[in-house]
Every structure is written in structure tokens, then in C-alpha cells.
Amino acid sequence: MTHLPRRTFLHALSAAAAGAALPLHALAARLKPGADAVLIVVDVQNCFVPGGTLPVGKGDEVVPVINRLAPAFANIVVTQDWHTAGHASFASAYNGKKPFETTTLKYGQQVLWPDHCVQGTDDAALHKDLKLPTAQLIIRKGYNPGVDSYSAFEEADRKTVTGLAGYLKARGIKTVYVTGLATDFCVAWTAMDACKAGFACYVVEDACRAIDLNGSLAAAWKQMAAKGVQRIQSADIEGV
């Protein structure tokens, strides 16, 4: 796999737009990913599963679902949170701040997290049970010490792109399927940015888990629906 230093963009908790994510049972047939589809596996790392530094509830349950999905895709991209020590998104970088409080950085509001996914640590490693034989690219994000990164496509400053959109378009990709952790943060912002970049986008709900911080999960689904993201289950994909 190629390692591409990846930037992404921050999404603070924001108010939800109207609408609800569209379940795929409304569609006529099961989806069959072709050569123009990519599976994006977002941040399935030790830090985000039980026992990690920022565990997402039942985060490890996404691994077998993603492994079942993988053989249906000729193209897979993986993202990996890859923070510097003392990162600006860590509560420990500020006097008197606690995890899950917010602060204001130069690009806007920032949720403060426990120290997590520090470069080179086992905490930042991809989950050992992931089986992604057709993965071609790992995008590392959050390595800029002063900017958080959620989306696989843009950094939090909303100015710096990662190059992923160009990479996918150069390979003829038209449709993106997003899985991983966490639904209401990195998954949601990756999906919305995929639509922004001109791709059709599906979030595979049972291949994701959420943090759900102060209603962030419901807000994220509404925001995604408003941007054109479709909400599906792994069973909606042919061959899974």
C-alpha cells in the first residue's frame, strides 16, 4: 500500500440541516459496486475501539462487516488518524480544558479530544483483524500540529485538500462507499466531502459506529442527507 500523508478537515459539532438519511430499501435493486466504485475505510484503528484512548462504543464490531464488504470492491482506500504529540485538538494541550469541551482555533470551533492516535504508537495502528486485500492507498490525517482532520478529502481549515478527489477521479471512480469510525465525525465529513467533490456517496450504516456526543449522530445523519449522502446497510450490496 502507498502511504499518502493525508489531510482532512475539521467538522465541529454543527447544527443539523433538515431531512433524514435515505434508507436504501427504497431503491429497486441491490447495489453492485463496479470498477468505478471505491470502499473508503475510515480510521479503524486501535485508538477508536474498546481499550483504546478514544474508544467508540462497539467500534470493533465494524471489522467483520468491513471484511465481508471488501471482496466486493476492486478499489479500497484506508484512512488513518496520525496526530503529533501535543496536537491542537488534544484537551491536554490547554490549561484547564477537559476532553469533549470546545475551543476556538484559527479555522473555527474545535472539539477537544483525549490524546489519541499519536504517530508511531500501537494506539494509532490499524486494527489487526482488518482484511483488505485490494487496498491501494492509506491516507494519514491529523499530522498538521495546529489543524484537526476529519474528512478524507479536506482539512479542517476548509482550504487544504488531501488530493484524494483527484486520485479517485484519475482512476475513473464515480461512486464512494464509506465505512468506519466514527459515523458522526470522520465518516460523516468524508461522505459529505465526497458529494461535494462530485461523487455519488453511500454510508454503510452497519459498517460504522458513532460517538454520539450531545446529539451529534442524529445531526450528522440529517446533514449527510441534506448533502445527498445515501444511508444503506451492508445487505444492500450484492455479494455481501
Language model region names:
Residues T2, T8-L27:
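N-terminal export signals
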Residues L24-V49:
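C-terminal segment of N-terminal export signals and the immediately downstream linker at the start
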Residues V49-G57:
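Acidic/histidine-rich helix-loop elements
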Residues P64-T175:
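Active-site alpha/beta core segments
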Residues V77-Q80, Y202-D206:
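Short internal beta-strands
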Residues L132, G215-V240:
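Structural recognition of alpha->loop->beta junctions
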Residues A188-K196:
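Histidine-anchored nucleotide/phosphate-binding helix
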Residues E205-N214:
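Short, flexible loop segments at boundaries between secondary-structure elements
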